From Swiss-Prot:
GO terms for biological process: L-aspartate transmembrane transport. PROSITE patterns: NA_DICARBOXYL_SYMP_1, NA_DICARBOXYL_SYMP_2. The chain crosses the membrane at residues 13-33, 49-69, 81-101, 149-169, 193-213, 227-247, 294-314, 336-356, 357-377. The lineage of its organism: Bacteria, Pseudomonadati, Pseudomonadota, Betaproteobacteria, Burkholderiales. This is C4-dicarboxylate transport protein. It comes from Albidiferax ferrireducens (strain ATCC BAA-621 / DSM 15236 / T118). The gene is dctA. GO terms for molecular function: fumarate transmembrane transporter activity; malate:proton symporter activity; succinate transmembrane transporter activity.
């Protein structure tokens, strides 16, 4: 199929529709803030529609991927390599954030007295019991019941059950073929539902952006513009610098990858939620040649353990507060901060407002930096969350391709075809290509 025949009119492109919707949302929120804040249900509704479908999609993808594998040892290898990659990249993100905030020093010269700050707004984030310990976090991965995990949309709990189900189905051998076929076909129905939901993505992006600008205003951007600029710059450095090097070492270009997921990036920009494109990212990673089992394990796990954007935010925000309140931090204190963040950032994975919760817990644990300083960045946190979500999204996509490459589960020919031809039907209609390219994977026959 030629590129020309695959092109859609601009007004039918999801990319163009989301750009238009976000622009209108910004204008409405700025000029009619009261009306803009009333658009919040549109954004919330879209995100709820996506969350409705995430758990069953993860289940189907993981089960089909694992049950269809010949070597079960590869599942453990994939998981181990993924966790190793996540830890290394999270550490690099923390270090990059620490380096940039020390070089640019966005908080220097503000001379804020912590005692003069209104801390009422941060009470909800710093209340005792909000932060999970490591043991509590691990126990929370085990659901009280399977139904409860799916009903609440707990990604890690659903993932655990899906892995166990996939192993059991594989062990069942040929007797499980009927179950396997049903789950595989059901997954295609679910992705068709995703396609239907994505048609209203521009409406969701419009509502979320109108609410954000209407509630917080563009003025809050300018009041702490130096921190905002430094943070966005750091995210760009990490994506195109650090992830760029990682991508190049593994045989693909991060620039082409970002172009490939441009629609998903715009939706995340509008909704400030990387979860809003999780199902579509899973489709696109498979379309780039990553094996279903790798996609099913890495993407959902990455949403809890591979939060590169959040890691950058944590070190930058902590040191910014110290700079703004004239609180000196020695090199040893900053290294200690880094070490504590390596632990605490994992404990808050998947928790709403996790950035503030982790930051508050870390500042309390390290000592020296006033927790009250969180009030300084409360007003712009929503705008910073967009950069966090965008960086997290790119990071998880790159992680999937890299881990797939390491385990030998990445079709490099399909990868380069997908990245070099972003306007083909594969990019516009991923599920249609999935139907054509994914062949039936028989459940392994039981061994006598």
């Amino acid at each position: 199929m030629s590129k020309t025949s695959a092109r859609k009119p601009l007004y039918k492109s999801l990319y163009a529709q989301v750009i238009f919707a976000v622009t209108i949302g910004v204008l409405l929120g700025h000029f009619y803030p009261q009306l803009g804040t009333q658009m919040k249900p549109l954004g919330d509704g879209f995100i709820k529609l996506i969350k409705m479908i995430i758990a069953p999609i993860i289940f189907c993808t993981v089960v089909v991927g694992i049950a269809g594998m010949e070597d079960m040892k590869k599942v453990g290898k994939t998981g181990g390599l993924a966790l190793l990659y996540f830890e290394v990249m999270s550490t690099l993100a923390l270090v990059v954030g620490l380096l940039v905030v020390n070089v640019l020093q966005p908080g220097t010269g503000m001379h804020v007295d912590p005692m003069s700050l209104d801390t009422k707004g941060i009470a909800a984030y710093t209340a005792p019991g909000k932060m999970q310990g490591s043991v509590d976090f691990l126990l929370n991965v085990i659901p009280s019941s399977v139904v409860d995990a799916f009903a609440k949309g707990e990604i890690l709990q659903v993932l655990l059950f899906s892995v166990l189900f996939g192993f059991a189905l594989h062990k069942f051998g040929g007797r499980g073929t009927m179950v396997f076929d049903f789950i595989e076909k059901f997954s295609h129905v679910l992705f068709d539902i995703v396609g239907i939901i994505m048609k209203v993505a521009p409406i969701g992006a419009f509502g979320a952006m109108a609410f954000t600008i209407g509630k917080y205003g563009l003025g809050s951007l300018f009041s702490l513009g130096k921190l905002m600029g430094a943070f966005y710059l750091t995210c760009l450095i990490f994506v195109f610098g650090v992830l760029g090097i990682v991508s190049r070492l593994n045989g693909f270009s991060v620039f082409k990858f970002v172009r490939y997921i441009k629609e998903e990036l715009l939706i995340v920009l509008g909704t400030s939620s990387s979860e809003s494109v999780l199902p579509r990212m899973m489709e696109k990673m498979e379309n780039l040649g990553a094996r279903k089992s790798v996609v099913g394990l890495v993407i959902p796990t990455g949403y809890s353990f591979n939060l590169d954007g959040t890691s950058i935010y944590l070190t930058m925000a902590a040191v910014f507060i110290a700079q703004a309140t004239d609180t000196p931090m020695t090199l040893m204190q900053q290294v200690t901060l880094l070490a504590v963040l390596l632990l605490t950032s994992k404990g808050a994975a998947g928790v709403t407002g996790s950035g503030f919760i982790v930051l508050a817990a870390t500042l309390s644990a390290v000592g020296g930096v006033p927790v009250a300083g969180l009030a300084l960045i409360l007003g712009i946190d929503r705008f910073m969350s967009e950069a966090r979500a965008l960086t997290n999204l790119v990071g998880n996509g790159v992680a999937t391709l890299v881990v797939a490459k390491w385990t030998g589960d990445l079709d490099m020919t399909r990868l380069h075809q997908g990245l070099d031809n972003p306007t083909t039907r594969e990019s516009q209609e991923p599920e249609a290509i999935l139907d054509l390219q994914v062949t039936h994977m028989d459940v392994m026959k039981a061994k006598n």
